[in-house]
């Protein structure tokens, strides 16, 4: 059983896994600090409800230190713009471009949009890395199935 550590500002994720730990930010503990503390919990998977600030860099570094298979959400218009959004978030705490770190840590981006009373997968890209001045990606076909919240 993989040990999952779930980090959120607001408790929204429901997880049925037996080996899961849920932690939440507070007025005195922000997401970056929570992520750093998470490393001591020996996680196999790090799940962040939503990354909105420079904590994105801490998350990407954690994923690149033997904690693959993590999940987060980021608001953007397309799958490619999600990668650019991660660049913007990491720029809040680093003057160095972080495209290589993003290209190493992120494997898959799934873009979901609202559709009627539910949501649907708009686009899926596989991220293979960053080289030169662009992300190396493979685009998968659009999936048109509706996803309804339970």
Each language-model region and where it sits:
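Switch/coupling sub-region of P-loop NTPases
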Residues: 2-105, 111-115
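Conserved P-loop NTPase
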Residues: 103-150
